[in-house]
């Protein structure tokens, strides 16, 4: 309780355990964090768990053309959350499905995760699964406002997408 009160007065840098706030969030807390290493993901999940009362649902992926050996480790660390939604995160020139397969190889409890390759759909799915009192952690991109796919830089901001999906789920506002 003391920790929760203290953290309520602290503001994190953009994209670091940044709370996504909308007028009607259905009692679901959504946070965006840049956590893109196994240690950072584990710490972000632990931080959410320390202040939350409900379940923690994490949405995450791993970047393409980067250290492939960390992917199964990220998968294993994600299971510190109550549930995980594995998705795409800057696949660059790699096949997003192959990246996801590498991640899932480290996840030994199939009942506690699912794969949703489209990042927007993955964020929407996590919010859909959440109940009042739960927290959703969208990890990996943090402050970034783009998605790298092949040679394309596509506009994509986890914070904006999460706010849109919260509004759609609980506020009746449709998104495109």
Q: What are the residue ranges of the model-derived segments?
A:
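ATP-dependent carboxylate-amine ligase
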Residues: 1, 5-176
């Amino acid at each position: 309780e003391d920790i929760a009160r203290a953290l309520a007065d602290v503001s994190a840098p953009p994209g670091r355990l940044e709370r996504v706030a909308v007028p009607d969030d259905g009692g679901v807390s959504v946070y965006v964090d840049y956590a893109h290493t196994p240690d950072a993901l584990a710490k972000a999940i632990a931080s959410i768990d320390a202040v939350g009362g409900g379940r923690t649902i994490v949405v995450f992926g791993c970047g393409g053309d980067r250290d492939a050996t960390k992917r199964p480790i990220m998968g294993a660390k994600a299971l510190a959350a109550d549930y995980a939604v594995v998705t795409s995160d800057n696949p660059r020139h790699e096949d997003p499905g192959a990246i996801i397969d590498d991640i899932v190889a480290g996840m030994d409890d199939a009942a506690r995760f699912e794969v949703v390759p489209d990042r927007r759909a993955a964020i929407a799915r996590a919010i859909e699964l959440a109940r009042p009192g739960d927290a959703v952690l969208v990890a990996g991109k943090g402050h970034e406002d783009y998605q790298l796919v092949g040679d394309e830089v596509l506009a994509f901001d986890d914070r904006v997408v999460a706010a849109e999906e919260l509004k759609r789920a609980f506020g009746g506002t449709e998104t495109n």
